[in-house]
């Protein structure tokens, strides 16, 4: 289930990434929640879907989010997504630290 959530988050971020990512990262929690609610409400239409489960299916069914994104977004937008996600992840790294034990590598 976690991978589905990650996929949705990335899908939301990619729609924001084409120009508003800096502003999005500066929003407070209430503003961010409102923006994400608006974006997720537009996700189905953007992908030609009628509901969010269709969005999940379109973006996640191939198991390769990059490939799925490239079908719906330009290379530049996909690259912006990665940059934005990385920047935001670093600024909120403490929220994503669980389960990532450094030094105990799984080789």
Curated annotation (Swiss-Prot):
**Keyword tRNA-binding listed:** no
Query: One GO molecular-function annotation for this sequence?
Result: iron ion binding
Signal peptide range in chain numbering: 1-19
Cystine crosslinks? 25-60, 38-88, 49-54
Superkingdom, taxonomy of origin: Eukaryota
Q: Which Gene3D superfamilies match?
A: 1.10.150.440
- Indicate where this protein resides in the cell: Secreted
Respond yes or no to whether keyword Disulfide bond is given for this record.
yes
Keyword vocabulary terms for this entry = Antibiotic, Antimicrobial, Copper, Disulfide bond, Fungicide, Immunity, Innate immunity, Metal-binding, Secreted, Signal
Physiological role: Has bacteriostatic activity against Gram-positive bacteria, but not against Gram-negative bacteria. Has fungistatic activity against some but not all fungi. Binds and sequesters copper and iron ions. Copper-chelating is crucial for antimicrobial activity against M.luteus.
Q: What protein name does the entry list?
A: Antimicrobial peptide microplusin
The organism's taxonomy opens as:
Eukaryota, Metazoa, Ecdysozoa, Arthropoda, Chelicerata
């Amino acid at each position: 289930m976690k991978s589905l959530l990650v996929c949705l988050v990335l899908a939301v971020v990619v729609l924001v990434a084409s120009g508003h990512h800096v502003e999005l990262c500066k929003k407070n929690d209430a503003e961010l929640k409102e923006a994400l609610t608006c974006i997720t409400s537009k996700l189905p239409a953007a992908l030609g879907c009628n509901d969010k489960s269709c969005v999940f299916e379109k973006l996640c069914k191939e198991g390769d989010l990059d490939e799925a994104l490239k079908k719906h977004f330009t290379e530049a937008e996909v690259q912006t997504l990665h940059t934005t996600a990385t920047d935001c992840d670093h600024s909120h790294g403490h929220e994503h630290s669980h389960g990532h034990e450094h030094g105990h590598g799984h080789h």
